[in-house]
Amino acid sequence: FKSGAVHQAVHLRGCKFASGAYIMSPALEGAFTMIMGHHSFHHDTSAFPYSYLVEKEGRSVLMPGANLTSYGAVRDIEKWPARDRRTIRRDVINFEEYNPYITSGMLRAVDTLHAIAEEDPDAPTYVHQKAIIRAAALKRGIGLYNRFIVAALGAMLDRGESAERYDGSGRWLDIAGQYITKREVEAILDAIDHGELASPEEVDNRFRVFSVHYDDYAHSWAEGVYASLLGHIPTVAEIEEAIAAGRNARATMRRTTDADRDRDCSLDMAVSYGLDSDDEGEVRDDYYSVRGLK
């Protein structure tokens, strides 16, 4: 505060804080990061979505991609659209799990993790933007991200259509809940500057038009990424293979998160339930009833 009380911390979409979590501003976390403990070294983990950021021995320790194995993340993603009961939807909000914004972040995360490891392949730990990454967590993160990328590309290729007028290439942004290309945002700003969009309603309509064709733009982006990975424009058969691979990857990820849910809902967690019960069966029934498990 010596230079003024302007300390900004940004927690990107889906970040969640455990009880007692504390972050000293400025700081920045990647989308869908789970934060536990106290963090006062002004970290920047924006390059690593779906991570755990935990405090160990007073330091910030990052586990890249670890939140991809948590049923808590799945529950959040599924409950938000279910709880969106707006009768008048003034804001365009995209709840899609597999989207260009997050997936492009994971592509960059894989490159970043490889680059970090190559600096010292035998190091037990690494430090990146004030956060410690253990070698085992780094290696695991690459695998988790790659699986999500396969799942996401398949999902996006399975939606929308290929059309030149829906060019989704380039960088994507999360603008107040809407996934949209940076190119389109800049085009809207230019149209405002030139007087082509003269009212809030006209600006809003431009964002809504993009939203209507979101699946087509996302399909275009995914097809471009897939082409760069293959080194050529994918054939119809290769697109179908990518879609099938995506389904398999999503099924594998879901089995992992369901197993996490089962552990969290095991009878080991039934302590304190059924206080007036006479046997373990009644305790179990009370536990299942309260938790909504059966």
Stretch-by-stretch model annotation:
Residues 83-215, 219:
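Long, charge-rich C-terminal accessory regions
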